[in-house]
Amino acid sequence: VETWTVETDDDGSRLEVHSFRPAQPTGAEGNKPAGGSADNTGNSTSAKADPATVTAPGVVVIHGTLVTDALYRPFARNLSLLLSRPVHCYNRRGRAGSAPQPDDYSVQTEVGDLAAVMKATGSEDVVAHSFGGFVALQAARDIPLRRLVTYDAAVSLSGNLHHRWRPELEQAVTDGQLNHAWAHLVQGLATAGPLSYLPLGALRMLSIMSARTTVGAEMRELLPTAVKEMRAVLDADAELADFTQLATPTLMLSGGWSPGYFADTGRQLASAVPAIDFAVVPGQLHEGPIRPGKRLAIRIARFLNGTDGTITPQGRKRRRA
């Protein structure tokens, strides 16, 4: 994995990027990544890799809420091997190695950051999970993407996610009651499987226990970013008509064991937008992209390569027998 930074176009903030590339032929010095990192103009700066040496179009992976890109690196590595193309993860704002969320943070902050990463990496395709799927679908309305895959995209349509917002979550974060905040978030979003339906007291105890693990402690630290991200989703509440002009061939996936509202959103968008197709991935939880195994990566790679038979290059769905 190569670690480097991208400079954003708005305020010169930096985003930490981790890149996986297909093996380069040996003996060709000009094809080896150069030392140094790169800003969004491709100029070398100060880390470990220069993306300008790679000519194949890349894929950008956008992570979800309460996590960093570290959990997605095995998935990104598998996808790079399957596609024989570079795949790039980046830490969104508020994570170590990247700039903090600004005071005026919104979905446009995230869309601008994605555009900067795509420009710097020479990427054309996007794979996005949960909140990342929300960002990617908003971006596809404004910036050119070749192909897009989302998994459990957290898009608010006609206010369908507003009842999942818990004001107690924001208040608990403000008061520093992180175990209480985590419990409200899990109950509200229902993304933790059967655990989501436990009483608040039991969820608080689970939060205390999970804080002893690296991932659990990291999730607690990221709770303030989750508040701003959930606000951004609700503030960008949309209608189906807002997406009808989307032309990027898009595959929206949802896990068979994910909360049902993700699939409901995918089905609604696929029924209204010719460029969007939807499918359920049996046996997968909401955390599908960060769980072990290659099955999901294979499904996504086939779509990105245009070999799965779902959508034609013109973005129109094929008739199925």
PLM feature segments, named:
Residues 9, 13-25, 53-99:
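Conserved HGGG/HGGXW glycine-rich cap/lid loop of the alpha/beta-hydrolase fold
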Residues 2, 210-238:
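Hydrophobic, aromatic-rich cap/lid helix
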Residues 128, 132, 136:
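Gly/Ala-rich beta-loop-alpha elbow adjacent to hydrolase catalytic centers
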Residues 246, 252-254:
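Short beta-strand/loop motif that positions the catalytic acidic residue
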Residues 259-265:
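Conserved alpha/beta-hydrolase "acid-adjacent" motif
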Residues 88-127, 298:
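Active-site loop/oxyanion-hole signature of alpha/beta-hydrolase fold enzymes
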Residues 281-295:
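Catalytic histidine-centered segment of alpha/beta-hydrolase-like enzymes
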Residues 141-175:
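Flexible "cap/lid" loop of the alpha/beta hydrolase fold
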